[in-house]
Structure formats: C-alpha cells, structure tokens
C-alpha cells in the first residue's frame, strides 16, 4: 500500500486544485440566492447518505473493515464526476457544482466526524493514539481546502485562459482519478479480489438505493426535474480519491479501501457508458 499512500495526497490535491479552477464566487452566492435545492441536496448527501450506508452494513453484516470502508466512501462529498454526469443527464450543472464545492469544504469537518463515530459504533479500538479527528481534519484541509482556494485565486487572475481550457483540466482530473485506482488494483490486486464480491455488492446497493431515495426526496422538495437529477447523482457519485486518502491516513489494512476500489470500478464503467451514449446521440 506504500505507492498508494504516497500518490493519493498528491493526486487529491491536484484534483481539488482542478475543482477550484472551475469555481467562482458565483457558485457560492448561488447557494444564498437559491437555498431550497441546495439545502435538500446537502442534507441528502451529508446526513442521509451515511445513515443509509450504516443501515446497509448492518443488514449485510459486513466485516468491520469493509463496513468502515463503506462508511468512508459514504462520508466523502460529491466528486467532479458528478458534475460531468449531471451534464450528460441534462441536470442542473450549476447546482451540482455548488453542492460539490460546498460539500468539499465542509468535508474537512464532516468526514473525520462520520468516520471516527462509525469506528466507535463498530467497535474498532485499534486506532493509533497518534491518529485523531483533529489531525485528520488538518491534513484534509491541506489537500482539500487549500488547493480549492488556490485554484479560485488562479482563476480570478486568469479567468479567460482557465475558462477556455477547463475541459483539459477536467480530463486531467479524470486521469488522476484513474491513476490512483489503477495503483490500488496493481499493488493490492490479490487482497482486493478476495473481498471484491462482498464490497462490490454493498457499494452497488448503496448507490442504487441512495440515488433512488434522493431522487424521490428531491421530487417532493426541489424545484424541478433537472434539480432532482442533480441531487440524485450527487448522492451516488462521491469523491473516491478523498476516500482513499482518508483510508490510507487512518488504516494500514487494504481491506478498508476495497469498497472505494469497487466504487471506482462502478463509477468509471458508468461514466464511460454515459459518455458513449451521449456521443452516439
């Protein structure tokens, strides 16, 4: 797991820098000006998703390592992939960007809280005394918050250049995502395969259940169909690289990363399928 531990923080920082390059203050002001859809989305993503994941791991009786790995991916905010697929689905891309941006900034507090609380509920007691909720939050701030802010500053002074090349930035972040998970598969293939069936089923069920649930909740409270599609996708497509980073910072066992690896396989496959369908149409 040594290679993954080294490249995950770098890849995550670059991905978050790419996210920041695509953001402006308008994306945050939109939350204030149109709070209803955002509130529905952020509640589904940050509160409902971890609850559903916890109920699922109890129903499936997952081993502790896989259970906590599932909670790590459920705690992660939406990733850049959700923005791309929202566009493919004719959803509200602006809302998707706002949810991803704000969710990513909140994640430095929410992710450590959810992961450490889940570990306590699941009876995980072998965490090192050197690993604390505050310590993980500070590390996340360095590789999540700082790059996002830096990206926004760069965009502020080179907006025309960044805007004309944002598709290249998105492609690079997509490649980084694939590189991280390719490294996991190459380095820990045998260990991952031994757990993959159980973890893959759990992740697939979580995605389907949560995206369906979020869609119908949004149907009752959000303003329209594009917003429902956006909220549904935001609740099913998390920042897998961030989940890997958190897992490698807290645990030494690859089993904790298997749900994230399974999630990445599903995400890449689904994204490729949607992109192919979009080109065909």
Segments predicted by a language model, with ranges:
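Hydrophobic transmembrane alpha-helices of secondary-active transporters
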Residues: 8-30, 48-53, 73-81, 145-155, ...
């Amino acid at each position: 797991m040594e290679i993954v531990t080294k490249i995950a923080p770098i890849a995550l920082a670059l991905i978050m820098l790419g996210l920041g390059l695509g953001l402006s203050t308008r994306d945050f002001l939109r939350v204030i000006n149109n709070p209803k859809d955002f509130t529905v989305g952020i509640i589904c993503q940050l509160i409902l998703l971890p609850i559903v994941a916890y109920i699922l791991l109890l129903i499936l009786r997952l081993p502790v390592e896989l259970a906590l790995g599932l909670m790590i991916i459920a705690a992660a905010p939406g990733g850049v992939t959700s923005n791309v697929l929202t566009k493919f689905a004719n959803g509200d891309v602006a809302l998707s960007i706002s949810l991803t941006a704000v969710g990513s900034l909140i994640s430095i507090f929410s992710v450590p809280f959810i992961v450490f609380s889940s570990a306590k509920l699941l009876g995980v007691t072998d965490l090192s005394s050197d690993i604390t909720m505050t310590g993980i939050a500070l590390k996340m701030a360095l590789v999540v918050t700082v790059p996002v802010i830096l990206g926004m500053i760069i965009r502020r002074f080179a907006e025309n250049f960044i805007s004309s090349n944002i598709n290249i930035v998105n492609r690079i972040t997509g490649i980084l995502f694939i590189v991280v998970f390719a490294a996991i598969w190459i380095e820990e293939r045998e260990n991952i395969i031994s757990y993959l069936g159980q973890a893959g089923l759990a992740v697939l069920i979580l995605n389907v259940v949560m995206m369906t649930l979020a869609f119908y909740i949004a149907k009752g409270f959000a303003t329209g169909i594009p917003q429902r599609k956006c909220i549904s996708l935001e609740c099913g497509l998390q920042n897998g690289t961030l989940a890997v980073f958190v897992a490698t910072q807290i645990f030494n066992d690859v089993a904790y990363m298997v749900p994230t690896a399974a999630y990445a396989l599903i995400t890449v496959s689904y994204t490729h399928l949607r992109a192919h369908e979009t080109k065909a149409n």
